[in-house]
């Protein structure tokens, strides 16, 4: 028992030096998006983030973020992009769900996923966005899926 303990103590410095170290300093309290004061409901929900790296991109890596948003323009998932490890963010695109009659409805529970392997007609690196589209009368729940071959 003592021998195992001493062996683990001897191996600890090797593990500490082999552990990857971040190339950037850590930070906190970065605001990605602030709803305009003109919005009647100044809230967002279900924020999600994905690190893109299925094509072995070089640093700096790209982060994408999305969330649920309902505005006068309709419900959509905004896509924001960061190329500096999340220190700053810029709008990249918006995903509107257009199948069915969702006028005045809600889009909830977004999820971003970058495919690690090819599947059917989708190559590795394809970005998938899925969400729950609910019509204004709440008569159904509709899981919708969109794909992007250009990272957003």
Question: Model-flagged regions — what are they?
Answer:
Residues 19-45, 50-105, 114-152:
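Beta-rich carbohydrate-recognition and catalytic domains
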Residues 1-21:
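Fungal secretory targeting signals
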């Amino acid at each position: 028992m003592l021998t195992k303990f001493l062996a683990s103590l001897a191996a600890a410095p090797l593990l500490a030096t082999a552990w990857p170290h971040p190339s950037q300093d850590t930070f906190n309290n970065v605001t990605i998006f602030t709803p305009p004061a003109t919005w009647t409901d100044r809230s967002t929900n279900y924020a999600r983030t994905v690190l893109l790296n299925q094509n072995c991109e070089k640093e700096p890596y790209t982060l994408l973020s999305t969330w649920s948003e309902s505005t006068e323009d309709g419900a959509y998932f905004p896509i924001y992009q960061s190329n500096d490890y999340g220190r700053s963010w810029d709008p990249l695109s918006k995903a509107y769900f257009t199948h069915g009659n969702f006028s005045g409805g809600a889009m909830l529970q977004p999820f971003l996923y970058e495919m690690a392997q090819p599947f059917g007609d989708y190559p590795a690196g394809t970005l998938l966005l899925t969400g729950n589209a609910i019509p204004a009368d709440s008569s159904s729940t509709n899981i919708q899926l969109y794909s992007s071959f250009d990272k957003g």
